[in-house]
Amino acid sequence: MKAMHTFENHTPMMKQYLKIKAENPDVLLFYRMGDFYELFYDDAKKAAELLDISLTKRGQSAGQPVPMAGVPYHAIEGYLAKLVQLGESVAICEQVGEPVIAKGPVERQVVRIVTPGTVSDEALLPEKQDNLIATIYQEKTQFGLAVLDMTSGCFQISELQDAASLQAELQRIQPVELLYSEALEDKHLIEQFKGLRRRPLWEFELSTAIQLLNRQFGTKDLRGFGVEKAVLGLCAAGCLLQYAKETQRTALPHIQSISLLQNSDTVQIDASTRRNLELTQNLAGGTENTLAAILDKCVTPMGSRLLKRWIHQPIRNIEKLQYRQQHIQMLLQQNLVEELQPLLRQVGDMERILARVALRSARPRDLTRLRTALEQIPFIQHQLTKIPHFVAFSQQIADFSVQLALLQRAIIDNPPLLIRDGGVIAEGYNEELDEWRSLSEGATRYLKDLEQRERANTGIDTLKIGFNAVHGYYIQISQGQAHKAPLHYVRRQTLKNVERYIIPELKTYEEKVLKAKGASLALEKQLYDEIFDQLLPHLGDLQLASLTLAELDVLTNLAERAETLNYVQPQFSTQVGLQIMQGRHPVVEQVLKEPFIANPVELNQKRHLLIITGPNMGGKSTYMRQTALITLMAYIGSFVPAESAVIGPIDRIFTRIGASDDLASGRSTFMVEMTEMANILHQATEQSLVLIDEIGRGTSTYDGLSLAWACAEQLAQKIRSLTLFATHYFELTGLPEKIEGIHNVHLDAFEHNDSIAFMHSVQEGAASKSYGLAVAALAGVPQNVIKSAKQKLKQLETLSQQNSYQSQSVLTQVQGELTLMEEEENTSAVIETLKTLDPNELSPKQALECLYQLKKMLN
C-alpha cells in the first residue's frame, strides 16, 4: 500500500478506506461499494491473483492510480470459499449509514472477519469434516495446545511433553488455522500448515486467559472443568478465545465448556501410522479406499464428522467401548436400523445450524431445517423406548415442543435465502406485520384499477403503469400517443419509444407503498432477531440433543456396517495380546473382485514378535495393516472383520511401512526409515502394537541386516511389544532359536514353471524362498533381463556354496558384532564412571562399594 504520509491528499472515500484498512492490516478488506465489494492497493493485487479476477484502476487518489479489484455482492460466498480454502482471512466491510442523510462517504464498518478456522457459513465449510482452529504455546521443550470447533462449540486443551507429541496431535486434528506465539522457537513444526497466524506474547498471559474463560463460562474458577492445572494449555486457550471473539464481533454462547484431553485416555497414533493405515486419507491424498470410506455410511453430516473423530482418536476406556458395543448389538437384535436411519436423515446438520443460531447468522432455511430436525425427535424417542439400553440415551434429549411450535408459527415452509429479502415470517404470526404487508401487497390491485381508470379518462389504449428502482411508479405512454397526455401529467423520463409521467395521486401512493414495504422489512428483521432471543436460552439443551443424535447416527451406522459386511463383536481382555481368528482387511476385501483370504493372528506374552517372510505381493503388508485396523476398529467400539477377536490392552499403534524420501527436509529414504524406527524404539511399550516392514533397506546388506537384527532383538527382549516384523533378510528366521518370544510365519506361494500363484494364506514357519524373479516377470520385466538374472542367481548360489562357512555364520557374526558393541558400551560406561571418581575423597567402604559396582557394570 502507498505510504500513509500522503493520507491528507486522498479523497474522502479513500481516507475512510485507509482508516478501516489500518485497523485490519493482516486480512483482505472487502469494502462494500453499492452492488460490489471492492479491494484496493495490495489487497486488490493479491485478490486478483488468488481469485483470477481482473485487476483494474479506480481513478486517482493522492495523485496516484488506485489498483482495484471487485466482486458482485450476490456472489461473495463463492469467492470467500476459495479464499478460505487457501488459508486467507477476509474482513467484510458493510455500509451501515443511510446514503440519503450522509454528508460525505456513507458510514461503513467491519461487520465480521471470515477466517478459515472461525467460519460458520454452510457454503464455506466441508460438510463431513471437522473445521478446527488451534493455538500453540511453547515453554522450554513443552507445549500447550488449544483446539476449538467454532461450528459446534467444542473447546479442548492438552499439554504435550515434546515436539514429536505435538506433531502427532497436529496431524490428528489437521487445523485449518493455527495461531502461535511470536516466541515460538520450533517454527519448523508448523511450516506445512496453512492459515498460520503470529500472535503477540501478551495474548498468552495466564491471568488474562483465566479471566477470559471464566467470563465466557460464567464461572468463578475453572476447577469444575478439571483444567486448572494445565497452565500451558490455558495460556493457549486464552489467546484462542480472544481471537475468536475478535473475528466474530459477537457473543459466543455456544462455547459453554472446556475440557482437558490426556494422552492416557486414548490409543496414541503418530502421523506416520495415520498415513500408512490410510484412516481418512489415502496415500495419494484422496478419500477413496480408506477406512472411513468403508465405515462411514452415516445419514447426517454431524454423524460422519463424529465417526472420523472416533477413528482418529480411539479410546482406552473399556467401559465406554462395551457401552457402544451393547448399543450396536441391541440395534441389530431389535431390527431398528431401518426404522431409525430415515428419521435421522431428516435431522440433518443440527450441530452446525445451532452454531449459526448462537452467532445470530442463521439464515431462514437454517431455521426450517432446525424445525424439521425437532419434528423428528418424538418419533426417534418412540423408537428408542423399545430398547431398555437406550432409555438413558433418550433422556439426554429434552422436550423441545415449545421451540418447535415457535418455528412452526413463525417461519413459512419455503422461505427465501436471506431475511433482507422479506417474506420469511409466516402470515398470522404478527398482526402489525400483516397490516403493513396488506397495504404493500394491495398495491397490485390499486395500480390495476388506476391503470384502467386513466385509460378510460384519456382514451389512450397503450397507457400502462410501471415501476423501477430509480424513478419509482410512473405512467407510460407510447411516443405515437404522447400528444394525448393530459396537462396534469408531469413528464418524468423520455425514452426512444415511450414517455413516462407522474401524477400527484400516483406519487402519494408510491410514498405510502414504499413506506409500507420499508416498515414491513424492518419489522420482519426485528421479529427474526426475536426468534434467536427465544431459542438461545435453550441452546445448551439443543446442543446436547444434537450431540446425542450424532452419536445415535454413528452407532446405527456401525450396526448397519456390521450386518452388511459380516463383522463380529470383539471381546476385550485384561491380558496383553491379540487373538484374531480369520481376520480380514476391511478396505481390501471391499475392493477385491475375488474373495478375500482371511488369516489369523496370535500375539501374547509368550509369542510377542512374528518374523513374517514370503514373496513381494504375497500379502505381508496387507496382513500387518489388517491387524492394526481390526485393533483400531475394536477401540472405537465397532464390530470387526473376523470370525472372532480377543483384544488386550493397547496404548499405541506404530507402523514402519513403505518407503519414501523427504526431499523438502533433505532426508533420504533410509534417513526417514531410521527416524521412524528410532521413534518406535523410544516410545513403544509392552502394550504397543508395532508393525515393521522391511527395515534396513537403503544401505549395505550387512548394515541393513545388523540393524534389522538389533531392532528385532530390542523389540522382543527389552520392550516386549506386540510386533509384526516383515523382512526379506532370511537370516532373521533363525532368531526364534536364539530369542524367546519370537516366532516365524510366512505368506504362502506356489511356483510352476515360469509362473507364480500367491496363496495369501499365513502359515507357521519361515518361507522357503523369496520368488523375486517370478514377481519381476509378473511386473513385466523383459524376458531377456529375467533370463540374465536367473543365470546370475545360479552363479551367486554356486559362490555361496563355495563359501558355505561364511554364509552359515552371517547371523553368528552379526550377533557377535552386536555383543562386542554391548561390551564396548559397558567398558565405555566404566571408563566414564572412573573419570568422575576422586580416590582421595573415598572412604575404604565407599571404595569397596564402587569396585563392586564397576564389576557389575562390566558383567
UniProtKB/Swiss-Prot annotation:
Keyword DNA-binding assigned: yes
GO CC, any one term: cytosol
PROSITE patterns the record matches: DNA_MISMATCH_REPAIR_2
Coiled-coil ranges per UniProt: none
GO molecular function terms listed in the Swiss-Prot or TrEMBL record: ATP binding; ATP-dependent DNA damage sensor activity; damaged DNA binding; mismatched DNA binding
Keyword terms, alphabetized: ATP-binding, DNA damage, DNA repair, DNA-binding, Nucleotide-binding
Gene Ontology biological process terms from the UniProt entry: mismatch repair
Amino-acid positions noted as binding ATP in the UniProt annotation, renumbered to this chain: G614, P615, N616, M617, G618, G619, K620, S621
Function per UniProt: This protein is involved in the repair of mismatches in DNA. It is possible that it carries out the mismatch recognition step. This protein has a weak ATPase activity.
Family, as annotated: Belongs to the DNA mismatch repair MutS family.
PANTHER family the record matches: DNA MISMATCH REPAIR PROTEIN MSH1, MITOCHONDRIAL (PTHR11361:SF34), DNA MISMATCH REPAIR PROTEIN MUTS FAMILY MEMBER (PTHR11361)
Protein name: DNA mismatch repair protein MutS
Source organism: Histophilus somni (strain 2336) (Haemophilus somnus)
